[in-house]
Amino acid sequence: SVGFKAGVKDYKLTYYTPDYETKDTDILAAFRVTPQPGVPPEEAGAAVAAESSTGTWTTVWTDGLTSLDRYKGRCYHIEPIAGEENQFIAYVAYPLDLFEEGSVTNMFTSIVGNVFGFKALRALRLEDLRIPPAYSKTFQGPPHGIQVERDKLNKYGRPLLGCTIKPKLGLSAKNYGRAVYECLRGGLDFTKDDENVNSQPFMRWRDRFLFCAEAIYKAQAETGEIKGHYLNATAGTCEEMIKRAVFARELGAPIIMHDYLTGGFTANTSLAHYCRDNGLLLHIHRAMHAVIDRQKNHGMHFRVLAKALRLSGGDHIHAGTVVGKLEGEREITLGFVDLLRDDFVEKDRSRGIFFTQDWVSLPGVLPVASGGIHVWHMPALTEIFGDDSVLQFGGGTLGHPWGNAPGAVANRVALEACVQARNEGRDLAREGNEIIRKASKWSPELAAACEVWKEIKFEFPAVDTL
């Protein structure tokens, strides 16, 4: 005999361990599992633990050369999901030694790798991850974080205002720079490259960077405020991306931008390191996230992508609006917004938070609310997101009937009115419309904006529910 029993495995025997006490150093995962008909939940949960850690489909004799108990993932708890037939939350604990230090790429390759194509499962979704301090301490994290950003910009006590330059594709560099200048001059803190703007035939990246830098300096000189434009450094290769970041630094730009999912975590982490070493803020766009996170029973929830970004590094990240044109249910959105900003977040299932997360000293990330929002949303946004956020109005600035600068003025006046009202103790949720109406009496720009967008709503039921 060869000393082991050949044949296909029953995963449950090795990988389902309901008595396991989780360690402080384990990475914990909560999976929403939909087994194929006839597959018991324990077997499905164990299969997930096995396939995302040390297991393979059959017994191999090299198993005897390692300590399986030390390295295997363990499914330690399974609970049915209320209101769903044949869906379960499977909790899996992974020993820390399974993962390379400082690599989101490696962590995801294991935890959300091949296991998602596993035949015994009809669908699989990663709902949440608990990152232990022992692992998060191996990452640099955000280049600067919320407090350092406020100090760099000298802006306190209010949300920051941004605007994505539209039309997103087709403008020449000079016209693009003009739009940037007008928005910043009108009172915004930031303007933004659209995520699709990289270096296309109608506008090469170097020309755009130059004209935008000119716009920033001109607006700063005229307003006495620090201004920024998110220069999108995303490129086809990591080398080209860094080349663009270097040029942005040479121009004295305060902030650059990256599409972290399409660009990839390896590229993003490299860029975040460059940004900290060179004093650049890093704005992160989440293009492609809905491919991964929008299906309720398969893929990965955005809160996991948000945690991964905080490890990989970024100072801002788009996080839904709750009120605009893009997906986001209020409590769930606030759950991952807190996971981005706060040092310590308690487990709270009503907000979709499955684990208590302690970030220790990893800097926080500013959530960005962007997509289909306008001046009438300002009270709600100020109330929902609070001061530590960036509110971005693309069409809600550039769609102003009098032009870009008046659009920016309208947003800035609306924001200042909301912050002042809140500081005076007024209830933004109830009195929001009244606050905006009153402010518009003193600002013709705001009055015009109020008139244009008074009836606009994007009312569809949210898909992202608990």
Curated annotation (Swiss-Prot):
Record-listed E.C. numbers: 4.1.1.39
Active site residues per record: 166 (proton acceptor), 285 (proton acceptor)
Record text on cofactor binding: Binds 1 Mg(2+) ion per subunit.
Modified-residue entries (N6-carboxylysine), positions: 192
Cellular component GO terms, alphabetical: chloroplast
Post-translational modification: The disulfide bond which can form in the large chain dimeric partners within the hexadecamer appears to be associated with oxidative stress and protein turnover.
SUPFAM superfamilies for this protein: RuBisCo, C-terminal domain (SSF51649), RuBisCO, large subunit, small (N-terminal) domain (SSF54966)
Gene3D superfamilies: Ribulose bisphosphate carboxylase, large subunit, C-terminal domain, RuBisCO large subunit, N-terminal domain
Annotated GO biological process: photorespiration; reductive pentose-phosphate cycle
Keyword list, A-Z: Calvin cycle, Carbon dioxide fixation, Chloroplast, Disulfide bond, Lyase, Magnesium, Metal-binding, Methylation, Monooxygenase, Oxidoreductase, Photorespiration, Photosynthesis, Plastid
Keyword Chloroplast: yes
Modified residues (N6,N6,N6-trimethyllysine): 5
Cofactors that this protein relies on: Mg(2+)
GO MF annotations in UniProt: magnesium ion binding; monooxygenase activity; ribulose-bisphosphate carboxylase activity
Binding residues annotated for substrate, in chain numbering: 114, 164, 168, 286, 318, 370
Pfam annotation, one family: RuBisCO_large
Enzyme class: lyase
Function noted in UniProt: RuBisCO catalyzes two reactions: the carboxylation of D-ribulose 1,5-bisphosphate, the primary event in carbon dioxide fixation, as well as the oxidative fragmentation of the pentose substrate in the photorespiration process. Both reactions occur simultaneously and in competition at the same active site.
Quaternary structure and interacting proteins, as annotated: Heterohexadecamer of 8 large chains and 8 small chains; disulfide-linked. The disulfide link is formed within the large subunit homodimers.
Family: Belongs to the RuBisCO large chain family. Type I subfamily.
Extra facts: The basic functional RuBisCO is composed of a large chain homodimer in a 'head-to-tail' conformation. In form I RuBisCO this homodimer is arranged in a barrel-like tetramer with the small subunits forming a tetrameric 'cap' on each end of the 'barrel'.
UniProt-recorded name of the protein: Ribulose bisphosphate carboxylase large chain
Organism: Moringa oleifera
Classification lineage: Eukaryota, Viridiplantae, Streptophyta, Embryophyta, Tracheophyta
